[in-house]
Amino acid sequence: MTKIKIVVIVGPTAVGKTALGISLAKAFNGEIISGDSQQVYRQLDIGTAKATQEEQEAAVHHLIDIREVTESYSAYDFVQDAQKAISDIVSRGKLPIIVGGTGLYLQSLLEGYHLGGQVNQEAVKAYRNELEQLDDHDLYERLQVNNITIEQVNRRRAIRALELAQFADELENAETAYEPLIIGLNDDRQVIYDRINQRVDRMLENGLLEEAKWLYEHYPTVQASRGIGYKELFPYFVGEMTLAEASDQLKQNTRRFAKRQLTWFRNRMAVSFTAITAPDYPQVVHDRVRDFLGQKEKS
């Protein structure tokens, strides 16, 4: 089976994935698929660092603004949506470029999670329904029985981890349809932390506070409100923190998130990284993509 070539750009938040994705889309006749769990939500633009209108006009973007904030979204949903987007892009003779920092989503797509050729979908659904009927105590007992630990304990993550364990053999044998070129972006820790701090300041200047307040007043308990960029500001709205304290908390949580992202990509996806401050960084990446596609450099 001839596999579909796709480019995947990963790295910590604020590293510059969107800009690189647009650059590659222009150079290689590509379209971008967002691989971010929060950018699917309509009306949440600033806190999710969604591509701006100008950026979306510079390159076609998929899987942005496809859910209401009241809806849930999972790795399973992403794999289904991403597969459809990839098929659509390829059918028009273009290159799919996935840009995102949600490691589980990307790994699920690239390794055939749920949708691999040999995974029985009815069995997956039946097992998920069984897990959803369990109370929290029984669900976490299942985790212990299967020797599963998850970084952040909640029902959604617990069920997903148990599904992966239950169908591990099928997933290992499932044939993925894609041949990915994974491009990792990173730099010295202080460079990334400075970029994060500057981004948070820009977000606040551009209206993040108003966006977060709207979410807090209308939908404070939905899945979308638990994303970094919103929940840190909620204490400010009820007088438990000053704005400066909430801003510092947001920066700190984002830095911690960036560290977790890097750990995931290194351990789960074996990504090698390119430093964004290297003088030849853009050219090196473009050359890698050109070689991957078997193209010659234009004279």
Curated annotation (Swiss-Prot):
**What residues bind ATP, as annotated?**
11-18
Family as reported in the entry's similarity comment: Belongs to the IPP transferase family.
What span is annotated as the signal peptide, if there is one? none
Task: Return one Gene Ontology term, BP aspect.
Answer: tRNA modification
| Swiss-Prot/TrEMBL site (Interaction with substrate tRNA) positions | 102, 128
Q: Which domain of life is it from?
A: Bacteria
What does this gene product do? Catalyzes the transfer of a dimethylallyl group onto the adenine at position 37 in tRNAs that read codons beginning with uridine, leading to the formation of N6-(dimethylallyl)adenosine (i(6)A).
Q: What is its EC number?
A: 2.5.1.75
Which cofactors go with this protein?
Answer: Mg(2+)
The reaction(s) annotated as catalysed by this protein in its Swiss-Prot or TrEMBL entry are:
adenosine(37) in tRNA + dimethylallyl diphosphate = N(6)-dimethylallyladenosine(37) in tRNA + diphosphate
Under HAMAP family, the record lists: IPP_trans
The EC class name is transferase
**Where, by residue number, does substrate bind?**
13-18
**A Pfam family name for this chain?**
IPPT
Keywords of this entry: ATP-binding, Magnesium, Nucleotide-binding, Transferase, tRNA processing
* Name of the protein in its database record: tRNA dimethylallyltransferase
